[in-house]
From Swiss-Prot:
Belongs to the HisA/HisF family. The keyword Amino-acid biosynthesis applies. Transmembrane segments: none annotated. The gene is hisF. InterPro entries: Aldolase_TIM (IPR013785), His_biosynth (IPR006062), HisF (IPR004651), IGPS_HisA/HisF (IPR050064), RibuloseP-bd_barrel (IPR011060). GO terms for biological process: L-histidine biosynthetic process. Disulfide bonds: none annotated. It comes from the Bacteria. PANTHER family: IMIDAZOLE GLYCEROL PHOSPHATE SYNTHASE HISHF, IMIDAZOLE GLYCEROL PHOSPHATE SYNTHASE SUBUNIT HISF/H IGP SYNTHASE SUBUNIT HISF/H. It is an enzyme of class 4 (lyase). It comes from Yersinia pseudotuberculosis serotype O:3 (strain YPIII). This is Imidazole glycerol phosphate synthase subunit HisF.
Length: 258
């Protein structure tokens, strides 16, 4: 059995790490490189960086900080933000990232997933899904351009259908960003995770809602996700990664303990 992963998420805007609630009202958390170093030292298994306005701004992620991060940490990291071509991905991987993640650009052009997977291998290609639970229809809807409150919009994709589609196209890993739970720290959407786990045959990462160590445990135990991504509980030092992993190990979760 592969070890479960704890993955701090760093949303980047204007060169700094920020954090919002339900993808809105972002506050500045701090500088990118020191935070990356801190999480690596605490025992994170990998890091994910989202340049949250790159796609809506029509640009690719700023590569200068990617290179700086690669110099100071020794764990894998994934970068997302406006990657629309094989050339964009090549630059980010050349600057030191281990994986690239695409979200809105994949919705605009699903063939991008296949082209990237063919060039770099599926192990390098992560697809992020921003998913919103609509209470009226009792369904999960995929959203696009969520880094910009003015441009955020629902797509025609139901989350379950998009999960199936991107696997066919070559996604090597899926990060499910559950927008209703984002930043509110009341737990991952286990119902949604269980539904998607049943149809997901590549590594599935839960994102959105972690507030306590038990929330991580529930995601691993009850939804069998491969990794749990979180931001505010780590940024605000509510949960220490080393202590979290010790707790999870004590509860029988297969995890790399620092």
């Amino acid at each position: 059995m592969l070890a479960k992963r704890i993955i701090p998420c760093l949303d980047v805007k204007d060169g700094q790490v920020v954090k919002g609630v339900q993808f809105r009202n972002h506050e500045i958390i701090g500088d990118i490189v020191p935070l990356a170093q801190r999480y690596a030292q605490e025992g994170a298994d990998e890091l994910v960086f989202y340049d949250i306005t790159a796609s809506s701004d029509g640009r690719v992620v700023d590569k200068s900080w990617v290179a700086r991060v690669a110099e100071v940490i020794d764990i894998p990291f994934c970068v997302a933000g406006g990657i629309k071509s094989v050339e964009d991905a090549s630059q980010i991987l050349t600057f030191g990232a281990d994986k690239i993640s695409i979200n809105s650009p994949a919705l605009a052009d699903p063939t991008l997933i296949t082209r990237l997977a063919d060039r770099y291998g599926v192990q390098c290609i992560v697809v992020g899904i921003d998913t919103w639970y609509d209470t009226e229809s009792d369904s999960y809807q995929v959203y696009q351009f969520t880094g910009d409150e003015k441009r955020t919009k629902a797509t025609t994709w139901q989350t379950e259908d998009w999960v199936k589609e991107i696997q066919l196209r070559g996604a090597g890993e899926i990060v499910l960003n559950m927008m209703n739970q984002d930043g509110v720290r009341n737990g991952y959407d286990l119902r949604q995770l269980q539904q998607m786990r049943a149809i997901c045959h590549v590594p599935l990462i839960a994102s959105g809602g972690a507030g306590t160590p038990d929330h991580f445990l529930e995601a691993f135990r009850d939804a069998d996700v491969d990794g749990a991504l979180a931001a505010s509980v780590f940024h605000k030092q509510i949960i220490n990664i080393g202590e979290l992993k010790k707790y999870l190990s004590e509860q029988g979760v297969e995890i790399r303990v620092c």
